[in-house]
């Protein structure tokens, strides 16, 4: 199924130009619920690197919802064109991920991104970037904290507390499984933070990470 981008831009940018573009695109993020009436598929995206970082390997894993059974996948390899710069992950990874999405038979109703969304120094992480370009609802699910501070989180599965940066709530610290480290959830595009947390928990029935992320990581690192 063809991927019709809602917005597009050049990718051959310097790190300074890329950071400025994030600031310009940030107002396009919709941090309120605008999901499809029914979500039948959810996807995870992840990226690995081959040949000492010279090749980007992007993977998309699509799962039926609510069964979370794999239904489609795509893997793309292409030369890495952008350096590793903290906070500019999307410029290194998104060109290959967009190509992988283009190869799917059917676009997913929701994408969980292995990375951050609004919980980002310029409030425009890779989950926001992907959502704004494609128009698909997206959630950032980070394994580590990029910005912000938080209080003590209860041990029970489903517990969550705000992630605060300055005077702003930028995400949520979420316990997806009792006795394991939390994940850092943030809005990507077209949903609110409570809804993002709810969907992450729905997609994380057994392990610390969502099943979408686990399947995409398996493809990206195989």
Curated annotation (Swiss-Prot):
Binding, Mg(2+): 46, 114
Superkingdom: Bacteria
Enzyme Commission number(s) of this protein: 3.1.21.7
One GO process term, biological-process aspect: DNA repair
Reaction catalyzed: Endonucleolytic cleavage at apurinic or apyrimidinic sites to products with a 5'-phosphate
Gene Ontology cellular-component annotations: cytoplasm
Required cofactor(s): Mg(2+)
MF (Gene Ontology): deoxyribonuclease V activity; magnesium ion binding; RNA endonuclease activity, producing 5'-phosphomonoesters; single-stranded RNA binding
Site (Interaction with target DNA): 84
Keyword Hydrolase: yes
UniProt entry tagged with the keyword Metal-binding: yes
Matching InterPro entries: Endonuclease-V (IPR007581)
Keywords (A to Z) from UniProt: Cytoplasm, DNA damage, DNA repair, Endonuclease, Hydrolase, Magnesium, Metal-binding, Nuclease
Compartments where located: Cytoplasm
Function: DNA repair enzyme involved in the repair of deaminated bases. Selectively cleaves double-stranded DNA at the second phosphodiester bond 3' to a deoxyinosine leaving behind the intact lesion on the nicked DNA.
Family: Belongs to the endonuclease V family.
Name of the molecule in the record: Endonuclease V
Annotated organism of origin: Methylococcus capsulatus (strain ATCC 33009 / NCIMB 11132 / Bath)
Gene: nfi
